[in-house]
Amino acid sequence: MNTNRRDFLKVGAAAVGMVGLAGGANAADAVAKLPVPDGARFAGMSGAWAAMYTPYFRGGEKDGQLNEEMIEKLVEYFVRKGLTGLYLTGSTGEGFLLSAEERERVYRRVVTSAKGRLKVIAHVGCLSTDDSCKLARKAAAAGVDWVSSVAPVYFGQSFEAATDHYKMISEATDLPFLIYSIGKKLVPDQTVRFFDLKNVHGMKYTGRDYYDLGAMCRKLSKPAIFFAGADEQVLNGLATGRFSGCIGSTDNDIPATYVKICELAAKNDFAAAAKYQEQSCRFVDALFSVKGFFKNSMRYIGLDCGNPRRPDGIPITDAQYAEIEKAIDALGFVRKNDAVA
């Protein structure tokens, strides 16, 4: 399975005109919420989520090591911007490039920093099903709200293997389980069968075939929650009425943009929401236009999360960061040092 998040952000991203909409959401404001299914497990899940970057130190003796102090700063920023929750150590969070011990540290630090102000989903997928189950139990012990996983990666490329993989992980804890669908075409008659498994109650859908998704949803035998995972397609997904929110990479950089998309879609004000979706598309377009943009862009808002780990990323130079800064300046809607101003 190809889990390259960039492939799923890039398709459909287009440069659009500047709309001049700087987003500063106030989490204390009474806002409209996208609907969620009935049931306690779905309470408080509606809205925009960041697939959180896993922060590392940049430079010095700790270069590339997990930066837990930055995790606390990220959490505070996301709370202030009105995000609903965080999705940890998935594709954006470089889960497969972290050790199990590092992933557990991320879960624990996020939960203790959030203090119940953000919902937390831990992606626990590993190459080995057994390792995934062990990590799921560690995540549950850390206090996360849900666990999640991609289908088998590299090995186990069959529906039967994926079913067994999900069965084992979802039964490893009593927490609700969120399928992470990315990289393969959704086959309604097959995919719906995942929802017959214990504790499987939702999906992060990083795809664009809303027809097949709808066909699958009509076959569900129990309530389930869905999140749009392709940043540049969030509003398209919300317009189908199938999604309760979004989980994405660039929600880290411009969280208020996605908060506004969800709020306005909940009010059925899609014309206003489209202006914020244009911000998303322009930011995603910059991500693919400038070398080293991914993750290093967080320096612009004052939250340096370090370089992506090899082989996913090669450390950037000061000159390359200057190009990233120039590209974000040109967008006109991202406030420099927003997290510390």
Question: Predicted regions span which residues?
Answer:
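Structural motif
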Residues: 11, 81, 142, 172, ...
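C-terminal segment of N-terminal export signals and the immediately downstream linker at the start
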Residues: 23-51, 61
